[in-house]
Amino acid sequence: MSFRALSVFSLFLSYLILGSAEQCGRQAGGALCPGGLCCSQFGWCGNTDDYCKKENGCQSQCSGSGGDTGGLDSLITRERFDQMLLHRNDGGCPARGFYTYDAFIAAAKSFPAFATTGDDATRKREVAAFLAQTSHETTGGAGWAAPDGPYTWGYCYNRELNPADYCQWDPNYPCAPGKQYFGRGPMQLTWNYNYGQCGRAIGVDLLNNPDLLATDPTISFKSAFWFWMTPQSPKPSCHDVIIGAWSPSGSDQAAGRVPGFGLITNIINGGLECGQGWNAKVEDRIGFYKRYCDTLGVGYGNNLDCYNQRSYNNGPSVDSM
């Protein structure tokens, strides 16, 4: 037996012996490890190469940096954040004053692989893509002649307008009495089972306290990062797509699903926006993305839309949350 095989076997054996180790990944409903630890192929948390290297089967938070933002605050400074989300604190925005730069940076510390993987262009492109998709979800610039253009009005809302309960029976994540699970936060997370999974991953009881996504800005950003960083089979994570770590399977290729910003739209809201030809919502997402890429001085990459992509049929997304 090689040293590598022995190492993996020993690691697996230790999991059987140490039943108290914290679970994560597909073995634990997509849960993330606390403190930015890596999730191994076996669903346990740690910070060594056996846990953290992709080639060793790492499932999430694979940088192993233990919570460092890796220079995110230099990649996107407070001034640049304010420039990109220019009108988020406008008097007409219901969420004015909520989405702060400090909360954005603090939340990112729980997801150390965000915008720290790859070269400078890849890191900037991930920031642009994340802010673009979440800006579309929270935009206040649609449907009127918005000053400075519609793509300066992201992060205007933190609650869904005219919401329903979004409660569906689930044995693992039952709805709490009197609670509603409508869209909240940058990614507008919906449905009780998504609140439950997200809360479990970030260590917050969101089933009983769903409104934390609209009252605590750091937790709110964490919910969006959780969605961004977490794969939900058969969907890859948005993170893996934008950094180039995902390759389409045969079924993906047959469905026209190719790497690029457009696939992220498919992951988030493909059931309503993809595979149907031109779509104004897809164009809005692309508009935000191009503006943010231009602001950060990085190219857009290929395959920006999902017009010819079939949507995924399962896994959490904005259209199925």
UniProtKB/Swiss-Prot annotation:
InterPro entries per the UniProt record, alphabetical: Chitin-bd_1, Chitin-binding_1_CS, Endochitinase-like_sf, Glyco_hydro_19, Glyco_hydro_19_cat, Lysozyme-like_dom_sf
Gene3D superfamilies membership: 1.10.530.10, Endochitinase, domain 2, Endochitinase-like
Keyword Oxidoreductase (UniProt): no
Residue ranges of every copy of the Chitin-binding type-1 domain listed in the record: 22-64
UniProt cross-references to PROSITE patterns, sorted A to Z: CHIT_BIND_I_1, CHIT_BIND_I_2, CHITINASE_19_1, CHITINASE_19_2
One of the record's GO cellular component terms: vacuole
Induction note: In response to infection, elicitor, ethylene, wounding.
Compartment annotation: Vacuole
Chief localization: other
EC number: 3.2.1.14
GO terms of biological process kind: cell wall macromolecule catabolic process; chitin catabolic process; defense response; polysaccharide catabolic process
Chain segments carrying region Hinge: 65-98
Family the UniProt entry places it in: Belongs to the glycosyl hydrolase 19 family. Chitinase class I subfamily.
Protein name per the record: Endochitinase 1
Species this chain originates from: Theobroma cacao (Cacao)
